C-alpha cells in the first residue's frame, strides 16, 4: 500500500486516463471560449460604444458598454447551453 492508502503499484486504467484527458480538454476549451468571449466583447462593444476614445468614459459610454456586455454574455450563455444540450443528446444516441 502507498503512503496515502492507495496501491502505489497500480497504474491508472485506460478509463481513468480517458477521464483525466477529457477533463483537461474541457478545461482548455472553457479557457479558450472565455478568452474568445472577452475578445469579442472588447472588440464589438468598445467600437460600438466609444467612437472617439478620450481620457475618461462619459456616463452614456459606460451605460452602453455595460448593456452591450450583458447582451453578449446572455447570447453566449444561450448558445453554450444549446451546444451542451445537443452534445449530450448526441452522446446518448451513440451509446
Swiss-Prot record:
Motif extent (Twin CX3C motif): 45-68
Coarse class of the protein's main subcellular location: mitochondrion
UniProt key word Metal-binding: yes
Keyword field: Chaperone, Disulfide bond, Membrane, Metal-binding, Mitochondrion, Mitochondrion inner membrane, Protein transport, Translocation, Transport, Zinc
Cysteine pairs bridged by disulfides in the record: 45-68, 49-64
Molecular function terms, GO-annotated: metal ion binding
Single Gene Ontology BP annotation: protein insertion into mitochondrial inner membrane
Entry GO CC: cytosol; mitochondrial inner membrane; mitochondrial intermembrane space protein transporter complex; nucleus
Membrane topology: Peripheral membrane protein
Domain of life where this protein originates: Eukaryota
Summary of subunit composition and partner proteins: Heterohexamer; composed of 3 copies of TIM8 and 3 copies of TIM13, named soluble 70 kDa complex. Associates with the TIM22 complex, whose core is composed of TIM22 and TIM54. Interacts with the transmembrane regions of multi-pass transmembrane proteins in transit.
Domain notes: The twin CX3C motif contains 4 conserved Cys residues that form 2 disulfide bonds in the mitochondrial intermembrane space. However, during the transit of TIM13 from cytoplasm into mitochondrion, the Cys residues probably coordinate zinc, thereby preventing folding and allowing its transfer across mitochondrial outer membrane.
Family to which the UniProt record says this protein belongs: Belongs to the small Tim family.
Record's function text: Mitochondrial intermembrane chaperone that participates in the import and insertion of some multi-pass transmembrane proteins into the mitochondrial inner membrane. Also required for the transfer of beta-barrel precursors from the TOM complex to the sorting and assembly machinery (SAM complex) of the outer membrane. Acts as a chaperone-like protein that protects the hydrophobic precursors from aggregation and guide them through the mitochondrial intermembrane space.
Protein name according to UniProt: Mitochondrial import inner membrane translocase subunit tim13
Organism: Schizosaccharomyces pombe (strain 972 / ATCC 24843)
Amino acid at each position: 500500500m502507498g503512503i496515502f492508502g492507495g496501491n502505489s503499484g497500480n497504474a491508472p486504467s485506460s478509463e481513468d486516463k480517458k477521464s483525466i484527458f477529457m477533463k483537461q480538454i474541457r478545461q482548455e476549451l472553457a479557457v479558450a471560449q472565455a478568452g474568445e468571449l472577452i475578445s469579442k466583447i472588447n472588440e464589438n462593444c468598445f467600437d460600438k460604444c466609444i467612437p472617439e476614445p478620450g481620457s475618461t468614459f462619459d456616463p452614456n459610454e459606460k451605460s452602453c458598454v455595460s448593456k452591450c456586455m450583458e447582451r453578449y454574455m446572455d447570447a453566449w450563455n444561450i448558445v453554450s447551453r444549446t451546444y451542451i444540450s445537443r452534445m449530450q443528446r448526441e452522446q446518448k444516441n451513440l451509446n
